[in-house]
Design a protein with these regions (language model features):
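Tandem repeat scaffolds
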Residues: 1-169
Length: 169
């Protein structure tokens, strides 16, 4: 397109395997990405707005400047990735895995994250991590490192939050 993006919008990409060093400037807007695997060092400047991401696996080192606004998916695996400036606002990512992620300057406002796991995740941000008006029912924030977070007007039923203070002592 005019901005230099590869346009893979509104496509059925079920069970595709994207492999390479860097995946950059790709638009997956409104695409069906069920059972897709991304295997690369970095995904940058990509747009997954309103995409269906059921059972997607991100085997990457880093996602940078990536948009997931209004994306929906069950069992999305982001584990062990650096999520740097990722916008998850208004997304529905249930039963998803954010375990051992380093999450920097990312937005989770208005998200539905039912039963997702952030075990041993680190929230490294210049400002507070934001989960404003999110549904965090049964979400596990277990042994996380977080300096400050905004959970204003969020549903937190059955949410578990335990903070790892080990580097303080």
């Amino acid at each position: 397109d005019a901005q230099g993006y590869i346009d893979l919008s509104e496509l059925d990409l079920t069970s595709c395997h994207f492999k390479g060093d860097v995946i950059s400037k790709v638009s997956f807007i409104s695409s069906n990405l069920q059972h897709v695997t991304f295997e690369c060092k970095e995904i940058g400047d990509c747009n997954f707005t309103t995409a269906i991401v059921d059972n997607v696996i991100f085997k990457c080192r880093r996602l940078h400047n990536v948009i997931f606004i209004k994306a929906s998916g069950d069992y999305v695996d982001f584990s062990k990735n650096i999520l740097d400036t990722v916008d998850f606002s208004q997304s529905q990512l249930t039963h998803s895995n954010f375990c051992e992620c380093q999450i920097r300057n990312s937005n989770f406002d208005h998200c539905y994250l039912y039963a997702s796991h952030f075990t041993r995740a680190e929230f490294l941000t210049d400002k507070e991590i934001s989960f404003i008006k999110s549904n965090l029912t049964a979400v596990m924030f277990d042994h996380v490192r977080i300096s400050t977070g905004n959970f204003k007007d969020s549903v937190t039923q059955l949410m578990v939050l335990s903070i790892d203070y080990s580097d303080i002592f």
